[in-house]
Amino acid sequence: MKIIEFAYPNVPINEEQISLCLGFFDGIHLGHQTIIKKAKKEGYKVGVLTFDNSPAFVTGIINENLCLTSIADKAEYLSDMDVDFLYLMHFDKEATNITKDQFIHEVLKPLNPVKIFCGDDFTFGARGEGNAKYLSMYMPVEVVPLQKMDGVKIASRDIKKLIQTHRIQKANELLGRPYRINGLVVDGQHQGRSIDFPTANLKLDYPYVFPDFGVYMGYAEVYGKRYKAIINVGTHPTVIPLYKPIIEVHIIGFEGNIYGKDIFVEFIDYMRSEKKFDSVLELKEQLEKDREKAKNTLK
């Protein structure tokens, strides 16, 4: 997959016609995947036009810039789907002034789309005045209706809410894969090591959606190898409580120094709430139970 980064008005010119998918594509969830699959059926090479920053955040529609996927994540997932081109447009305050007609004639047309594919909620141009109906006056457009699974909307906003309320399994179903974050392992207080339960403290590489406080089972990818893991999100109230929540990962079966290394962490299921134990011994006993459950449950 070729990645083309640009900022308006320096839009790349594509010589060959392509099927072009439009949207922010946060999460590359099942709804997004449906759009891309429909585009691939046209028989042309497929491009995805998205943005380096959330238009909803830049324009003030939402207050928090929390995402399900980083730019690197999106590139990986789109490449896995055999997308040919990823057009990454810089989106800042100035970009909010691009009119709907400028977007059509000066951004889309140079990319040479034979057909546009988008969700039914896609808007573009200053104040979001452009929509699929308006766009169809200038080029062929296929609108992919909002998808649902078991009555739940497959939408980035709804998936974020699921993650923030412990419902990781349902979020993963809508994503079509486990929710994954990437972070740098940083030095911590070494409290886990003192009870033979070492953890990797993560400094997130991107403003990912933070799961609600609690203990989760999942996987950690270290040096390209996938390990079972238990993940604590919170302030570890039993041992030197923190003011700011962190993500700590106990990587089952791994021994080694990974400080300063980037690792991937996948959340598979919620196990229990975070709680303050009466003693460190009681905490250790519970952690051992958590580890055993994760080892036996995860494949």
Task: Describe the function of each predicted region.
Residues 29, 78, 116, 171, ...:
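Residue-level signal for inorganic ion chemistry
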Residues 45-47, 84-85, 114-115, 140:
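Residues at the starts of beta-strands that form the adenosine-phosphate
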